[in-house]
């Protein structure tokens, strides 16, 4: 048995950091964007701007938490690509994706994507003090507030010129959503990162408005879950429980709310976050230590998805830190970590984590190792948060 923070250090040193360092594209900038299940790297695969932002965040945060200056050039490499290629200098905002050599591939603008750039740029600024990174983050904050909102909250998908378009990218399960829980969560996260870097009262005000929506519109107290997809008036479009997003929100919104330092607000949001974490513990945690993906109209999707496992470790640790008497949260965090080590980690030479496992426990060979959504953000952040928190958990 070892302390989970030490296990996290080992995971970073032995697997995550070497893997993502090796994807640096020295010739065309940024990081390679696609590797198939068999670990074949496609050097001409698309480069998702979300993936690049998440890599920038990962190396920036890792350099800070591990106090390892050797990681700064990897963060800078992602930063240069974001600044020079991902940003649209004509219309503002960040493109959805680029070609392998840095030309716009999908030039649409999505609120979710802008938020991740803010999150990454804020971390890079905190690491380096680079004023330009902070200015870019502030510009994207202003852009979201000006171009991606209406009186009810945040909208989702836009053309390059910021004309509204349909939200295919963040809609799933056969619905077309005008608002999503997922985008709201990550706008809050990006703003929290910017607030951590600036203590800007404007950013704090936007965060508080998001928390009002979270508490009043997203959270469903009767079902102990977040609703996922909405029309413009926040009517839920589908009976869906996203176990991964619920456990992620339970710690991430808790963290961001804590930055604001408002006692009453913290108390109100903490009650919601604890309810979400408890519901995942009761309904989604499996006897083998895994957490299933989601439940749509009463039917459970039993895939074990990489990011859901990572967020579950962190969500259960956070819930136990808030409620030390509830040792079942502490035990659950250890169980999920052990499941990750046994099943989700891809132990092949040059492997990282499998995208997901089928219900029979075999890796899904259709899912690649790297693609625009498969990134070091969830598993890397889990490790870095475990090191930062150093909870009394052994695995």
Go through each PLM region and give its residues:
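Glycan-recognition and catalytic cores of secretory/periplasmic carbohydrate-active enzymes
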Residues: 1-395
């Amino acid at each position: 048995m070892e302390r989970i923070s030490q296990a996290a250090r080992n995971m970073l040193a032995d697997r995550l950091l070497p893997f993502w360092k090796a994807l640096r594209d020295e010739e065309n900038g940024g990081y390679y964007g696609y590797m198939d299940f068999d670990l074949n790297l496609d050097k001409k695969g698309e480069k998702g701007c979300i993936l690049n932002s998440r890599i920038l965040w990962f190396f920036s945060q890792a350099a800070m938490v591990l106090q390892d200056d050797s990681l700064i050039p990897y963060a800078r490499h992602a930063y240069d690509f974001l600044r020079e290629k991902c940003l649209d200098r004509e219309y503002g905002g960040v493109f959805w994706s680029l070609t392998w050599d840095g030309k716009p591939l999908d030039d649409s603008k999505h609120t979710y994507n802008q938020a991740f750039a803010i999150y990454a740029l804020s971390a890079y600024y905190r690491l380096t003090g680079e004023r330009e990174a902070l200015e870019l983050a502030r510009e994207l904050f202003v852009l979201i507030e000006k171009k991606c909102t209406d009186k009810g909250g945040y909208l989702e998908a836009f053309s390059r010129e910021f004309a509204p378009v349909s939200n295919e990218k963040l809609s799933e399960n056969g619905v077309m959503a005008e608002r999503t829980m997922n985008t709201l969560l990550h706008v809050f996260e990006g703003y929290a990162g910017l607030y951590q870097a600036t203590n800007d009262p404007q950013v704090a005000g936007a965060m508080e408005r998001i928390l009002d929506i979270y508490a009043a519109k997203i959270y469903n107290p009767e079902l102990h879950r977040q609703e996922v997809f909405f029309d413009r008036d926040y009517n839920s479009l589908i009976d869906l429980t996203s176990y991964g997003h619920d456990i992620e929100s339970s710690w991430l919104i808790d963290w961001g709310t804590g930055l604001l330092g408002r006692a009453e607000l913290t108390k109100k949001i903490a009650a919601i976050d604890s309810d979400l974490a408890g519901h995942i513990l009761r309904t989604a945690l499996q006897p083998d230590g895994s957490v299933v993906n989601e439940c749509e109209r009463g039917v459970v999707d039993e895939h074990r998805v990489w990011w859901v496992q990572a967020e579950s470790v962190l969500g259960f640790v956070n819930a136990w830190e808030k409620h030390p008497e509830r040792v079942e949260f502490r035990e659950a965090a250890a169980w999920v970590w052990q499941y990750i080590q046994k099943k989700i980690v891809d132990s092949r030479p040059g492997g990282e984590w499998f995208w997901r496992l089928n219900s029979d426990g075999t890796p899904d060979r259709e899912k690649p190792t790297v693609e625009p959504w498969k990134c070091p953000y969830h598993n890397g952040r889990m490790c870095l948060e475990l090191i930062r928190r150093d909870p009394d958990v052994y695995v």
